[in-house]
């Protein structure tokens, strides 16, 4: 089983990553990343702010990040993606409390989609950046990052699935990032968990809760190591429960009553 998640805008490069007795891995697609960096380096803070719809302060920060980005990734300029990304999904995952065995498992069974890096293993080193997949960054391959990445992410996902031994792909990514995957080109059974919270008597997807629940589902996968879709239905973290009637063959719906 392989799960995919989105990255996070919020990063933490100040806190040291947990110390495990195995090496971090190298991101595989940095030659492509370098092409994007070269394009992004041409923008002024004002131009980058307009492109990304971010504040002047964030635009200046990311102009500096693009200028400082290096093709070589090492312990001095980089941090493992699993511990560098912060945000609602990663709060639910709570990577800092993983055991060594769980980190080794998640390295095989989880991938993060990325606008700059394409696809990351949890222990792949990454440098600070902001480049969301939905950014309309004109490049030699087209008008945006979906055109730039083309089939590359899908091909590497297929390789990851082949290496870990079955064809179940659990899509825990946002629509923005999953748009970079071409499911019709994957030899996979793609499962999409959906998390609904009750509000005013109705169940709906609430972004903050849904993101955190995606992270909790990753945590559930690495703690229980399921090998079938049926076993995924046992997910009950955060008081969610599986709703058989609302679910389909490939969409698993989990609900949670309104919190008192």
UniProtKB/Swiss-Prot annotation:
Residues annotated as transmembrane:
none
Question: Which InterPro entries does the record match to this protein?
Answer: YaaA (IPR005583)
- Gene Ontology cellular component terms for the protein in this record: cytosol
Superkingdom, taxonomy of origin: Bacteria
One BP term from GO: response to hydroperoxide
| HAMAP family in alphabetical order | UPF0246 (MF_00652)
Q: Give the UniProt family note.
A: Belongs to the UPF0246 family.
- Protein's name in the database: UPF0246 protein APP7_0648
Taxonomic source organism? Actinobacillus pleuropneumoniae serotype 7 (strain AP76)
Q: What is the lineage of its organism?
A: Bacteria, Pseudomonadati, Pseudomonadota, Gammaproteobacteria, Pasteurellales
């Amino acid at each position: 089983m392989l799960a995919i998640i989105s990255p996070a805008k919020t990063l933490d490069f100040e806190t040291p990553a947990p110390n495990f007795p195995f090496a971090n891995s190298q991101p595989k697609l940095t030659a492509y990343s370098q092409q994007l960096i070269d394009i992004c380096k041409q923008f002024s803070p004002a131009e980058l702010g307009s492109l990304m719809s971010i504040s002047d302060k964030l635009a200046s920060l990311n102009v500096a990040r693009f200028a400082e980005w290096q093709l070589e990734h090492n312990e001095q300029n980089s941090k493992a993606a699993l511990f560098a990304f912060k945000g609602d999904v990663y709060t639910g995952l709570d990577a800092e409390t993983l055991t060594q065995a769980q980190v080794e498992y998640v390295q095989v069974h989880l991938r993060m989609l990325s606008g700059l890096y394409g696809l990351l293993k949890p222990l792949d080193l990454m440098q600070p950046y902001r480049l969301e997949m939905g950014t309309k960054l004109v490049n030699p391959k087209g008008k945006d990052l979906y055109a730039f990445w083309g089939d590359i992410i899908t091909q590497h996902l297929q390789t990851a699935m082949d290496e870990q031994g079955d064809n179940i792909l659990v899509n825990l990514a946002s629509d923005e990032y999953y748009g970079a995957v071409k499911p019709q080109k994957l030899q996979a059974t793609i499962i999409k968990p959906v998390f609904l919270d009750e509000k005013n008597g109705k169940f709906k997807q609430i972004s903050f809760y849904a993101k955190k629940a995606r992270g909790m589902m990753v945590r559930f996968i690495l703690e229980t190591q399921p090998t079938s879709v049926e076993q995924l239905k046992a997910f009950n973290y955060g008081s969610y429960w599986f709703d058989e009637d609302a679910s389909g063959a490939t969409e698993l719906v989990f609900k949670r009553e309104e919190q008192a």
